Amino acid sequence: MKKYLMVIASYPDWRQEFFKTHMSSRNKEYCQIHGFEYIEITEKLEPVRGKIGWIKPFKVQQLLKTTLKDGDILTCLDADMAIVKKDIQYIPSSAKSFAYSIDSGNTHCMGSYSIRVNDWSRKLFDLIVDEDRYKNLHNQLTIHERFGTYSSFWEGFYDQASWYSLAGIKRHSDKPFWEYSDYGWHSDKTLTGEVNEWCKYSLEELYEHVEILPTAWNVTELEGESSCEFLINKTPKEDVFIRHFAGGQQWRKEWFEK
């Protein structure tokens, strides 16, 4: 079994140098501690489907098809993430195929995740980037319950919106998904109470293959550091494993001094 950590960082501004100085160095140190091979992609990349955000899931699918073997681990982090606690290993539990966190903003966040390579996880990423699903869903208007407005979820959230459709997760909830039955899986209901027709996975299959990790693994909002407009799942500062500078917030080098 081999373990890989993949990060894609291709910024046109100061963030690229910040990434190189802080994130890249920490990622390499983390890989050395836990025996990961580090895959860092920093060259200028062409958008996929007209969006930078689709590059990562298509790259994952490519690795699953061409490079990775059954039993291997592929962990992916967004480039705006800081690994804080170096002693925690980011891999799924032995019986699971896919692991990710419900973040501070109460999203089933695809900014970071870990894959145990097998037939199920290969099929998962085939579905995440599936062209027919994309054509049918990327222009579909859905309601954001906080704002009461309709827009395309897929146009701004790419693979995350795709995962929501596969697991039947409602687009937004101000009630923590931790308080839902089944983590919010199958919460996207029709008016008749049925789960959305685009949901692919049964609850039984989700529980068999997917592991939901604590919010400390993807801290996107923190008092004193971000707007906290979507601070729904709070994490004490001392418990943060991964600090995610999402949504245009300030990148803070002090997180790399820990």
Name these PLM-found stretches.
Residues 8-10, 100, 244:
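Short beta-strand/turn micro-motifs composed of small residues
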Residues 11-13, 43-46, 81-82, 119, ...:
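Conserved beta-strand elements of beta-rich interaction domains across eukaryotes
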Residues 58, 124-258:
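Catalytic core and acceptor-binding pocket of nucleotide-sugar-dependent glycosyltransferases
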Residues 38-41, 74, 98, 209-212, ...:
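Conserved beta-strand scaffold positions in the cores of enzyme catalytic domains, especially
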Residues 18, 107-112, 251-255:
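Short, charged, surface-exposed secondary-structure boundary motifs
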Residues 50-125:
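GT-A fold catalytic core of metal-dependent nucleotide-sugar glycosyltransferases
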Residues 1-71:
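N-terminal anchoring/stem segment of glycosyltransferases
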Residues 1, 68, 92-94, 104-108, ...:
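Extracellular/periplasmic catalytic domains that process cell-envelope and extracellular macromolecules
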